[in-house]
A protein has these predicted regions:
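Short, structured motif recognition centered on aromatic/hydrophobic residues
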Residues: 5-8, 59-67
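C-terminal engagement/docking regions of AAA+ P-loop ATPases
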Residues: 60, 69-118
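Alpha-helix initiation/capping motif
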Residues: 52-55, 91
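Conserved C-terminal "switch" segment of AAA+ ATPases
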Residues: 1-51, 71-77, 117
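Residue-identity detector for glycine
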Residues: 44, 54-56, 105-107
């Protein structure tokens, strides 16, 4: 899980984005949950949910969808101007809002809400 957070952080940085600390902590809990849980694959074989999700592909999609959530959040805020930091920062809320649809799309169960508690 720690390595996947590092990969997500590097991917985001290459895209001129950054995760706030709470977002990184939530991702670490999410990846740990997926690594510890199992799900049957297309052949009915039990595999780690993280492997079913596709590790690197899942991380890339999480970064991209979290950026989309950030853009939506900023577009729908009452603020007229944003700092560069605000434009670059992906919050825990952005990450959390991107997770459930992504997991459902992969046929995986959404983890219990305690993974996103701070």
């Amino acid at each position: 899980p720690k390595e996947l957070v590092e990969i997500a952080t590097r991917m985001a940085e290459k895209r001129d984005s950054r995760f706030e600390e709470a977002a990184r902590a939530d991702m670490k809990r999410l990846f740990a949950h997926l690594a510890e849980s199992s799900t049957p694959d297309a052949n009915g074989v039990q595999r780690r949910s993280l492997d079913v999700a596709g590790n690197g592909r899942f991380v890339r999609n999480l970064v991209e969808r979290s950026e989309e959530e950030r853009e939506y959040r900023l577009d729908h805020s009452d603020a007229e101007d944003f700092t560069d930091d605000e434009l670059m920062t992906i919050t825990a809320t952005d990450v959390n809002n991107s997770v459930a649809p992504q997991l459902r799309g992969l046929g995986l169960s959404v983890p219990p809400s305690q993974w996103e508690q701070r």
